[in-house]
Amino acid sequence: MKNFIFTSESVSEGHPDKMADQISDTVLDEILKHDPSGRVACETFVTTGLVLVGGEITTSTYVDIEQIVRSKIQEIGYNNPNYGFDGSCCAVISSIMKQSPDIAMGVDNANDDEIGAGDQGMVFGYACNETDSLMPAPIYYAHLLMRRQAYLRKQNVLPWLRPDAKSQVTLRYENNKPVAIDAVVLSTQHHPEIQQKDLIEAVIEEIIKPTLPSSWLNKDTKYLINPTGRFVIGGPVADCGLTGRKIIVDSYGGMARHGGGCFSGKDPTKIDRSAAYMARYIAKNVVGAGLADRCEIQISYAIGVAAPVSVYTETFGTSKLSNEQITKLITQHFDMRPGKIIKHLALRTPCYQKTASYGHFGREDADFTWEKLDKVDILK
């Protein structure tokens, strides 16, 4: 592809699926605070008046799941019965079991370096030089729009905003480089009394224009703001939410492939999460070192086995080295065994709830250790 149009979407922290992700990761963080070796596979379901937390957890500590759920929902912004969902009075049900011993025997090991993969599967990591964060521009800016919406809502700058929202950014590419924004779609839940005309003007002037590069906005850019005309009913009242249902929002906005496994609610022995973070770390350092303009990494595993089954690199014709040469460099300088990934990226720290909204990649927070560019020099 040389000249094309590409679209990615993001959703707010008040979107039902993201609420579920955040609850699952908050449970995980609370366990890791007191039991860094805890095994967690936590799934959340949210719907009208109800939150159900289930999964498999093996830990030496106790966590108050009901309190975690209520606190997180209120923090997100569902703290008013008029919104149709209120963290202080919704029902909370938990159904938690221990991790299967058949799975545990594959990942339990006195030598942490030889921890086996918690399951079979493949993961992908991606980086490109379209943005300073080495993320694809469409998903990067879609996330920024949602962060801006949440900021204006929580700071009461636009007091009629409510928690549920979605964004979509369509970019025009020429010679494989983003040159203009073709369209912006932004839907936000709102107070019933706000007029559509005032809402559209405020969203464009207060959310979109301060967030997106002005050089990419022009007279041909299309703005589609709350296209149905009304978005009062939102959150779990309008749609059920489930952990792991926004895997493309969580990753690269469709610009790269995805192994299919979600991230949230999983401790780092689950390669769906830890190896995907490692794959991003590798791809970002490859691009950061100038070895390629775009890089996609695939790593695959077998349950109970520490060493990867395969490692694959694709640079889409943007590297002076062959894909095979880059793969050789990767295997020389990156240890992709789960135990080594956990140790190198410090993945037993309680850092996960902040990953559960606005993307797991391309973030500047120090806890996002997989975003470090500390292997650039040895790859050059």
From Swiss-Prot:
Which portions of the sequence form the region Flexible loop? 99-109
Biological processes, Gene Ontology terms? one-carbon metabolic process; S-adenosylmethionine biosynthetic process
Superkingdom: Bacteria
Q: What is its main location?
A: cytoplasm
Q: Which residues cross the membrane?
A: none
What keywords sit in the KW lines?
A: ATP-binding, Cytoplasm, Magnesium, Metal-binding, Nucleotide-binding, One-carbon metabolism, Potassium, Transferase
Where does the UniProt annotation locate this protein?
Cytoplasm
Record bears the keyword Membrane:
no
What are the required cofactors? Mg(2+); K(+)
Return the cofactor note field.
Binds 2 divalent ions per subunit. Binds 1 potassium ion per subunit.
To which pathway does this protein belong?
Answer: Amino-acid biosynthesis; S-adenosyl-L-methionine biosynthesis; S-adenosyl-L-methionine from L-methionine: step 1/1
Spell out the molecular function terms from Gene Ontology: ATP binding; magnesium ion binding; methionine adenosyltransferase activity
Broadest EC class assigned to this enzyme: transferase
Residues noted as binding L-methionine in the record, renumbered to the chain: E56, Q99, D239, K270
User: What's in the GO CC field?
Assistant: cytoplasm
Q: List ligand-binding residues for ATP.
A: H15, D164, A165, K166, R230, F231, D239, R245, K246, K266
> Which regions form coiled coils?
none
HAMAP family listed in its UniProt record: S_AdoMet_synth1 (MF_00086)
Q: What does this protein do?
A: Catalyzes the formation of S-adenosylmethionine (AdoMet) from methionine and ATP. The overall synthetic reaction is composed of two sequential steps, AdoMet formation and the subsequent tripolyphosphate hydrolysis which occurs prior to release of AdoMet from the enzyme.
Q: What is this protein called?
A: S-adenosylmethionine synthase
Q: Which organism is it from?
A: Rickettsia akari (strain Hartford)
Gene from which this protein is expressed: metK
